[in-house]
């Protein structure tokens, strides 16, 4: 095995073990059914194989938002039945349709939706406009393309909101955290995937790798 890859795997396993013991086992993997969190689950199983953490001790928590691909849901069920027993499925209280009808529609990306929503709510401050027009290099991901400038025209009648992620994903996990006295959680994310995750991971790297929020661990990047 490549020495660099082996070192990354070892470091990732150490971070998983460290979080497990620092939280007294009150932690989980945020499992999306995608390749990144599946890699983390494989690393958790590797820790179990060498007996550094108990078997099936870290729940892999999947949030069924109702808008995942059928193939993703099928894979999560397969994992639970065939590969890792401790998979828990949680669900949001509201549906995607309810969000569209009551909060607004997500467009382009979470960051763009956030600033477009602020603009539509009357926040026409200089900073908001600079972000949408790409003049603020710190949040360049908020820039809307020239072909989308009609979205800031007064006649644009589609209500935009970034509430989708908050209601469908963040709130269900917050509820799970509270109900289970969770002290920390693990995610798999790559800086290269861009958007809000890139900004979050980059900030963490700039802070010297210190974990942010509630003992959140991104065990590899």
Question: What are the roles of these predicted feature ranges?
Answer:
Residues 1-220:
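ATP-dependent adenylation/nucleotidyltransferase module used to activate substrates
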């Amino acid at each position: 095995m490549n020495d660099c890859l082996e070192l990354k795997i070892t470091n990732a396993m150490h971070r998983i073990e460290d979080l497990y013991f620092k939280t007294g086992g009150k932690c989980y993997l945020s499992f999306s059914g995608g390749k990144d969190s599946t890699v983390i689950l494989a690393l958790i199983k590797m820790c179990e194989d060498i007996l550094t953490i108990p078997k099936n001790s870290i729940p892999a928590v999947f949030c069924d938002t109702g808008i995942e691909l059928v193939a993703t849901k099928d894979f999560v069920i397969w994992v639970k039945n065939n590969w890792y027993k401790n998979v828990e499925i949680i669900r949001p209280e509201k549906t995607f349709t309810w969000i569209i009808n009551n909060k607004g529609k997500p467009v382009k990306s979470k960051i763009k939706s956030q600033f477009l929503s602020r603009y539509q709510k009357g926040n026409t401050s200089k900073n908001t406009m600079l972000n949408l027009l790409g003049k603020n290099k710190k949040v360049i991901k908020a820039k809307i393309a020239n072909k989308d400038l009609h979205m800031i025209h007064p006649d644009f009648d589609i209500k935009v909101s970034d509430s989708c992620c908050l209601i469908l994903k963040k709130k269900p996990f917050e509820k799970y955290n509270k109900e289970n006295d969770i002290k920390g959680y693990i995610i798999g994310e790559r800086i290269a995937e861009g958007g809000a995750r890139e900004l979050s991971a980059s900030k963490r790297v700039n802070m010297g790798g210190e974990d942010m929020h509630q003992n959140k661990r991104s065990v590899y990047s």
